Amino acid sequence: MISLMEARNLRKERTGVVLSNKMEKTITVAAKFKEKHPIYGKFVSKTKKYHAHDEKNECNIGDTVRIMETRPLSKTKRWRLVEIIERAK
């Protein structure tokens, strides 16, 4: 059986770039990933946007961040900021 702490660490994580920080305590993060085309087999680059909770309003546009899945915080927010990997220059 998985303990409570292990279950918390099994949540999904994404790494991406901050696109917007105009909302109060919320950032928009663009996460890139590659997906195989079902017919042709070529890997296609795709981007998905996530709204993430930034408790201290510490992110700026262009920062590379890590976000983690969490309970629903609003209609569109289901992710929270874990760490800022690299600051924008």
Swiss-Prot record:
InterPro entries given in the database record: NA-bd_OB-fold, Ribosomal_uS17, Ribosomal_uS17_bact/chlr, Ribosomal_uS17_CS
One protein family per Pfam: Ribosomal_S17
UniProt name for this protein: Small ribosomal subunit protein uS17A
Gene Ontology biological process terms from the UniProt entry: translation
Function noted in UniProt: One of the primary rRNA binding proteins, it binds specifically to the 5'-end of 16S ribosomal RNA.
UniProt keyword Metal-binding, yes or no: no
Superkingdom of the source species: Bacteria
Entry GO MF terms: rRNA binding; structural constituent of ribosome
Any one of the GO CC terms: cytosolic small ribosomal subunit
Entry keywords, A to Z: Ribonucleoprotein, Ribosomal protein, RNA-binding, rRNA-binding
Family, as annotated: Belongs to the universal ribosomal protein uS17 family.
Species annotation: Bacteroides thetaiotaomicron (strain ATCC 29148 / DSM 2079 / JCM 5827 / CCUG 10774 / NCTC 10582 / VPI-5482 / E50)
PROSITE patterns hit by this protein: RIBOSOMAL_S17
Keyword ATP-binding (UniProt): no
